[in-house]
């Protein structure tokens, strides 16, 4: 299994590539070729936090993914990220997890790239 940190991703994946990836993803969704159900939200009221889970499956790409974004505002008080996130990449043929990525950076890239993909 591949483990990719923010630094690893920066070395191999540019914002231009992220824009192109977003365009492909939007096309797959628009064409009904991607199963991307609504995200699941689980509250952690004791800690003023929540867990968000966003799965997707694209048969054409033989791939699935799961992004977990956790929002815990109190983390700022102890020097931890407020929105830590991870992305699991999963082989669509076998169900085996093939990579774990820094989801915080991936989310930042995707947010910017979505704007670029719109033009």
Regions found by a protein language model. Give the residues of each.
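N-terminal ligand-binding/catalytic initiation module
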Residues: 1-110, 114-116
């Amino acid at each position: 299994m591949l483990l990719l940190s923010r630094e690893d991703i920066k070395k191999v994946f540019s914002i231009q590539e992220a824009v192109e990836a977003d365009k492909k993803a939007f096309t797959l969704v628009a064409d009904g070729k991607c199963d991307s159900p609504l995200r699941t939200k689980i509250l952690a009221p004791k800690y003023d936090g929540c867990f968000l889970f966003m799965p997707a499956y694209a048969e054409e790409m033989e791939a699935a993914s799961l992004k977990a974004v956790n929002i815990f505002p109190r983390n700022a008080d102890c020097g931890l990220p407020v929105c830590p996130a991870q992305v699991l990449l999963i082989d669509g043929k076998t169900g085996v997890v093939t990579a774990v990525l820094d989801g915080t950076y991936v989310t930042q890239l995707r947010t910017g790239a979505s704007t670029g993909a719109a033009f």
